[in-house]
Amino acid sequence: MARDSLSEAGLHFDELNKLRILDPDVSQQTTELKEECRDFVDKIGHFQKVVGGLIELVDELAKETENEKMKAIGARNLLKSIAKQREAQQQQLYALIAEKKMQLERYRIEYDALCKVEAEQHEFIDQFNLQK
């Protein structure tokens, strides 16, 4: 009966028979909630550590990927420049071949002309020798 009147006044006895303002059930629920919150905070902290580690790993992989990408772009550009150099060199060689062909044709014409002059000179010498 005394407990009921105290309960109505908002005072309660706990399991150790100490006078409390909170209802023992509410106090126990509060304690349980506090424990659950502590566990939740610990789990969140662990989760943040795991996520932080994953973010660092992903950042490292992104950096490595970017480095490899730059290397690949550099290699591709080098291959393109080598191909352009070869093409330019090929064009130079074609131009040199054309120039040499023209020079060869000039030499043939000059040779034919010199052969004709030589033949005329031999003919002139032969006629000169016959007239003597």
From Swiss-Prot:
GO BP: cell differentiation; cilium assembly; protein localization to cilium; regulation of platelet-derived growth factor receptor-alpha signaling pathway; spermatogenesis
Gene Ontology CC terms, in alphabetical order: centriole; centrosome; ciliary basal body; ciliary base; cilium; cytoplasm; Golgi apparatus; intraciliary transport particle
Pfam families linked: IFT20 (PF14931)
Keywords for the protein's UniProt record, in alphabetical order: Cell projection, Cilium biogenesis/degradation, Coiled coil, Cytoplasm, Cytoskeleton, Differentiation, Golgi apparatus, Spermatogenesis
Residues forming coiled coils: 87-112
Subcellular location: Golgi apparatus, cis-Golgi network; Cytoplasm, Cytoskeleton, Microtubule organizing center, Centrosome, Centriole; Cell projection, Cilium; Golgi apparatus
Functional summary from the UniProt entry: Involved in ciliary process assembly. May play a role in the trafficking of ciliary membrane proteins from the Golgi complex to the cilium. Regulates the platelet-derived growth factor receptor-alpha (PDGFRA) signaling pathway. Plays an important role in spermatogenesis, particularly spermiogenesis, when germ cells form flagella.
Protein name as annotated: Intraflagellar transport protein 20 homolog B
Organism, scientific name: Xenopus laevis
